[in-house]
Amino acid sequence: MDKKASRIRRATRARRKIAELGATRLVVHRTPRHVYAQVIAANGSEVIAAASTVEKAIREQVKYTGNVDAAKAVGKAVAERALEKGVTAVAFDRSGFQYHGRVAALAESAREAGLKF
């Protein structure tokens, strides 16, 4: 099994458990150049809030879009947008990525901005 297939298998297992809880989830995806985050409704059919380093507003705040500082900016932005829509608590879906580096930075930043998980 290759690295990507292993990550997808871990992500599927975690998403199944979150779906059983019926919780709104904060989904993180990372590539070498960008970081993406979405708050998805419990039924899985609606994106409540989203932020990524592709957006011009976030790209202008950071020097490079693929590092920890960029992930912190995305975490803060997605948390603020979710709170505006009335979402205060989420389940953190790391998409099979290790809770380390950019993924952890995004999570901590979202917590500091007021999102509970």
Swiss-Prot record:
Transmembrane segments: none annotated. GO terms for molecular function: 5S rRNA binding; structural constituent of ribosome. Pfam families: Ribosomal_L18p. It comes from the Bacteria. Keywords: Ribonucleoprotein, Ribosomal protein, RNA-binding, rRNA-binding. The keyword Transferase does not apply. Belongs to the universal ribosomal protein uL18 family. GO terms for cellular component: cytosolic large ribosomal subunit. This is Large ribosomal subunit protein uL18. It comes from Vibrio campbellii (strain ATCC BAA-1116).
